[in-house]
Amino acid sequence: MDRKVAVHEDGYPVVSWVPEEGEMMDQKGKDQVKDRGQWTNKMEFVLSVAGEIIGLGNVWRFPYLCYKNGGGAFFIPYFIFFFSCGIPVFFLEVALGQYSSQGSVTAWRKICPLLQGIGMASVVIESYLNIYYIIILAWALFYLFSSFTWELPWTTCTNSWNTEHCVDFLNHSSARGVSSSENFTSPVMEFWERRVLGITSGIHDLGSLRWELALCLLLAWIICYFCIWKGVKSTGKVVYFTATFPYLMLIILLIRGVTLPGAYQGIVFYLKPDLLRLKDPQVWMDAGTQIFFSFAICQGCLTALGSYNKYHNNCYRDSIALCFLNSATSFVAGFVVFSILGFMSQEQGIPISEVAESGPGLAFIAFPKAVTMMPLSQLWSCLFFIMLLFLGLDSQFVCMECLVTASMDMFPQQLRKSGRRDVLILAISVLCYLMGLLLVTEGGMYIFQLFDYYASSGICLLFLSLFEVICIGWVYGADRFYDNVEDMIGYRPWPLVKISWLFLTPGLCLATFFFSLSKYTPLKYNNVYMYPSWGYSIGWLLAFSSMACVPLFIIITFLKTQGSFKKRLRRLITPDPSLPQPGRRPPQDGSSAQNCSSSPAKQELIAWEKETHL
């Protein structure tokens, strides 16, 4: 056995060798390990990222936050966070994936072994998203199937699930005798709570399984499975349709919305600036958390998708374009939402503030109610829920793809072989489906709200973003990462990006993080139902399970590394030498970058790379 023995600068032996036939892995085993693959072209990457970041939050969260926080004045804090946090962290994650050609866990492990917990935390958040986000698709499918009827089932109070408190306010003869003090409900509310959810009195009573939702959930998982089962080869093709079709639906709904009576008042309500609201710190916190939510930051998705890029792809230009596309979509979606809410307000003779909602309330109560007031209501209902379905679908299967990528990069010898990927995807899909069945019980909505409020909350994303920019800006070194980016795209990005990594982003993330904690209010379902103490404990356990990965893996890696404290620290903040070095093209045949020849200048750079900025 022919080994080459070197000595590490700390005095520990470093052994590297090429295994002989029969040692460690035979040649047949090598051939079975498949390459990671790459996007066929840039458009596949752009559409995949667009499909991931442009989702339901653009339609049901941003417009509501804009109206609630001062209308047009909300854009001031929004764009401050957009330029100082959104673009810099978005670009950081995409560039990290492209530079390392690794998923979220192994990319951070190679950049800084001490902070590999950042990648593990993103996997935890991805896992939670895979369980609960797809429930929204099950609801959308249920509404879509219910739209293929002569009369929309949430239009009248004559259905079997309606109660004596149901009042159809569109039918003025039935609504005339109802006083404002009566305890009434609308048919659209009863359809949502009694027909779709069958909701119980609280989280303590989960009730029985809603088998129709369980079947819709199964269909959603089957669709997601076949969207990604062939890796980026299939994902890259599917997104041509799933990422672009929602824009067609959005344009159709926009044209319909702005032509409705009352649309102008709704749009004015959406954009009318109230500069006094900028004095409220809550407005700034909402702007910051919306940026992190809508850009899919700290979920590992951007790193995984970027890892399939060619090494010299201009990820800087792509990142900026995608960030602007995401925000522009949110802005246009606001016109769709508030033009229809303005129409509802005029038809019912009530203020817009009483019909404006966010989240599931907007998608499954306000909009279904709005389409009942339009001619050809079945058509508009189908178009809306198809748009909702595709907005959520590509976000879901791209998130699933990123979880699979992280797993395969962590265990390439075991998983990157013929047929193993299909089995892995099937196993994750079945496991997530079985866990998701808990959320389609009669009390499942209470569990869904816990996941949504705590598991992927702004607090978690702000915490991880803080460590990401500290790792790249201060530990690995912002200048060093700029050198890596320059090697990939041919020039250095705008200096504001580096300034943001070093100062602006960590400062804003830290301030917003502590403010979020100080202003924490316990979750209430429908602003009425208070969870029991053990329910809130489960919620905080979901939140801390991701954030705890960072300090936990710092401790674990320290304990597993030998040497004095100083030597261990130095070794754990030294990047992996197999990472591409500036001026040297990364190997295309899977061989180690260490075996590539380099000039004296490059060797000097490699020696310098061992130093850190800590």
Swiss-Prot record:
Read off the InterPro entries from this record.
Na/ntran_symport, Na/ntran_symport_betaine, SNS_sf
Transmembrane region positions? 45-65, 73-92, 117-137, 211-229, 238-255, 291-308, 320-341, 374-393, 423-441, 458-478, 499-518, 538-556
Cytoplasmic topological domain residue ranges: 1-44, 557-614
Biased composition (Polar residues) is annotated at: 589-601
| Pfam families listed in its UniProt record | SNF
Please provide one cellular component term from the Gene Ontology annotations of this protein.
Answer: basolateral plasma membrane
Query: So what does this thing catalyse?
Result: 4-aminobutanoate(out) + chloride(out) + 3 Na(+)(out) = 4-aminobutanoate(in) + chloride(in) + 3 Na(+)(in); glycine betaine(out) + 2 chloride(out) + 3 Na(+)(out) = glycine betaine(in) + 2 chloride(in) + 3 Na(+)(in)
Mind giving the lineage of the organism this protein is from?
Eukaryota, Metazoa, Chordata, Craniata, Vertebrata
Its name, as the record gives it, is: Sodium- and chloride-dependent betaine transporter
Q: Provide the disulphide bond pattern.
A: C157-C166
Instruction: Give positions of region: Disordered.
Output: 574-602
Please indicate the ranges of residues that lie on the Extracellular side: 138-210
Q: How does it assemble?
A: Interacts with LIN7C.
Keywords of this protein's UniProt record, alphabetized? Cell membrane, Disulfide bond, Glycoprotein, Membrane, Neurotransmitter transport, Symport, Transmembrane, Transmembrane helix, Transport
User: Which PANTHER family does the UniProt record give?
Assistant: SODIUM- AND CHLORIDE-DEPENDENT BETAINE TRANSPORTER, SODIUM/CHLORIDE DEPENDENT TRANSPORTER
Give the originating organism: Mus musculus (Mouse)
Q: Which GO biological process categories is it annotated with?
A: gamma-aminobutyric acid transport; glycine betaine transport; neurotransmitter transport
Q: Which residues are glycosylated?
A: N171, N183
According to the UniProt entry, its GO molecular function terms are: gamma-aminobutyric acid:sodium:chloride symporter activity
